[in-house]
């Protein structure tokens, strides 16, 4: 049985597929907001922590950078279990929406 993921967690996983490995939380947040999903930093990092505990993502501390005053960024990477979850979600959405374009065009007139 596939694990249940909330809409926000799904969006985070889709974002990580798009952005690749070693992605900083700010980049994830920016991508989510560009795609129309406003998100607070607290909500994002709480969801990332949940996804990490479930084994879908891992995080590591990057190197200190001068632009951050020597602080290190936490970087996130999608794991194979997260990739499989995205593949299942994608297939489910594709199956559910098959033929929907034709129906919607008819409704538009």
Where are these regions (language model features)?
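Alpha-helical residues within the helix-turn-helix
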Residues: 30, 52-53
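Beta-hairpin "wing" of winged helix-turn-helix
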Residues: 54-69, 77
